[in-house]
Amino acid sequence: MEVRTDRSFLLPVAPATLWAHVSRVEHFQDWWPWLRRFDGRALAADQRWGCTVQPPLPYQVRFTIDLDEVEAPVSARGTVSGDIEGWAQLRIGPHVEGSDVRLTAELAPTNGFLRVAGRLAAPVVRFGHDWVLDAAVRQFRERAL
């Protein structure tokens, strides 16, 4: 089961201000309690972030993000590997109300349990994925801005 994401949302700060907040990687686990492990040092090209995510389901997802391209304050694109693999991209653009943020990704499970779960219970896997994204945006607004 491949999970594709194409989401856009508005945040009430200018792109440069938003980028300054997003670049504070040392605060990620404070903002996002479901991010159980994070060892990233910077939002910069050629960085590797190790992550463990706990959705509201009885499993954790462990993966790394290799930041391939980073263009401040506009975009970051990374290759994902581990329990899931694929790519993800964050793009930030100006909007009259602040910043237009777009997240796109194509991810697929490599872990045997997640592959089986994706085949047998695709809506549950999608729920977990969507829950993490929804929580991330909500908690970023509440805790980072």
Predicted feature residues:
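Hydrophobic pocket/interface hotspot
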Residues: 18-22, 28, 49, 67, ...
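Short, surface-exposed charged micro-motifs
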Residues: 8, 39, 66, 87-93
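Hydrophobic ligand-binding cavity/cleft-lining segments
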Residues: 1-45
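Intrinsic-disorder/low-complexity, polar/charged segments enriched in Ser/Thr/Lys/Arg/Asp/Glu/Gln
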Residues: 2-8, 48, 62, 75, ...
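Beta-strand/loop substructures that line and gate deep hydrophobic ligand-binding cavities in soluble
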Residues: 79-131
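Glycine-rich portal/gate segments that line the openings of hydrophobic small-molecule binding cavities
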Residues: 39-84, 135-145
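A short, structured loop/turn motif at beta-sheet edges
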Residues: 15-16, 42-45, 68-73, 91-100
